[in-house]
Swiss-Prot record:
Span of the transit peptide along the chain: 1-41
UniProt name for this protein: Required for respiratory growth protein 9, mitochondrial
InterPro entries in alphabetical order: NGRN/Rrg9
The organism's taxonomic lineage, starting at the top: Eukaryota, Fungi, Dikarya, Ascomycota, Pezizomycotina
Species per Swiss-Prot/TrEMBL record: Arthroderma otae (strain ATCC MYA-4605 / CBS 113480)
Keywords: Mitochondrion, Transit peptide
Main location per the UniProt record: mitochondrion
Length: 298
């Protein structure tokens, strides 16, 4: 009976030591285990218990280590390497690769050559076939040598009616492009004014004065040269006779009786200011309508 009680006490001691190793907190001992541990001596040594605990599997929180890569020298090139499966290409990528394989030089559309250019190529080649060879003409006109050969070999020529029709179409095309540019504000209208047909001559006369001034030393105009650009007022016979006499003498002239006389308004009819203002407005509108190209270089 005593041997059985001693073995039981030894088991309790071992369990208590294992528990103390597993948990950091001090375990609560009971009166039975306390009495048994103090009354009986342990038969299992403490070093044996520690050795048994350390030999058990331990848990590590560190990430798993990556496998070491094999050096390049150890790789056997004779064995086929496993390649990753490629993703299926979309339809547009397949078509793009096919076009690249077919047209290695890229997108080079044919250059359209006008009939005048073809005629120039024929004339140059007929003048000097060595200087204007097929290769030189191809480099000059930026087209392929095969196109130059076809142009030189072709015997087709346009008739006179076809040539006239083609030139008319080109003229209409030029006018249409100019009208479109004028609508977009990229080109100004013709400087010739329909209201005053003689205005172009006056502007050209003013421009010639400026050109003559630029050639002189210093490039300065005379004092009253800027008045030459504007048309002078033409006086009638009555107005000319009124200017010859005394401006303050109103006897015998009925047109100045009811008018306000001053140093500027004398010798003018009653409605002369209105007519002169209308004329200046018309002239200003013409200058604005012509654009900057039709104006004299003031």
């Amino acid at each position: 009976m005593s041997a059985q009680s001693s073995s039981t006490a030894n088991i309790f001691v071992v369990l208590r030591q294992l528990r103390s190793l597993c948990y950091s907190n001090r375990p609560v001992t009971t009166s039975l285990s306390y009495t048994a541990s103090h009354r009986t001596q342990s038969t299992t040594s403490t070093n044996a218990i520690k050795t048994q605990w350390h030999s058990s599997a331990s848990y590590s929180t560190a990430p798993p280590s990556k496998p070491e890569k094999r050096p390049v020298e150890d790789i056997d090139l004779s064995q086929p390497m496993k390649s990753k499966p490629k993703k299926p290409q979309p339809a547009w990528a397949v078509q793009k690769n096919a076009l690249k394989a077919k047209f290695k030089e890229g997108w080079k559309p044919r250059k359209k050559v006008s009939p005048d250019t073809m005629e120039s190529i024929r004339k140059l080649h007929s003048m000097d076939s060595v200087k204007y060879s097929t290769k030189n003409l191809a480099e000059e006109f930026k087209i392929s040598p095969e196109a130059i050969r076809r142009i030189l070999k072709s015997k087709w020529r346009a008739t006179e009616a076809e040539e006239i029709d083609r030139r008319d179409r080109w003229e209409k095309r030029k006018i249409r492009i100019q009208e479109q540019m004028m609508e977009l504000g990229l080109r100004h209208s013709d400087p010739v004014s329909e209201a005053r047909p003689g205005l172009q001559e006056e502007l050209s006369r003013g421009t010639s004065v400026w050109n003559a001034t630029e050639k002189t030393a210093g490039g300065y105009l005379p004092q009253k040269s800027n008045r030459e650009f504007f048309p002078k007022k033409r006086f009638g016979a009555e107005e000319r006779s009124a200017q010859d006499g005394d401006p303050w003498d109103v006897s015998g002239r009925d047109d100045l009786i009811d008018t306000k006389r001053d140093s500027f308004g004398d010798n003018w009819p009653q409605n002369s200011h209105m007519r002169r203002g209308a004329q200046s407005r018309t002239q200003t509108e013409d200058y604005h309508r012509q654009g900057y190209r039709g104006k004299p270089n003031w």
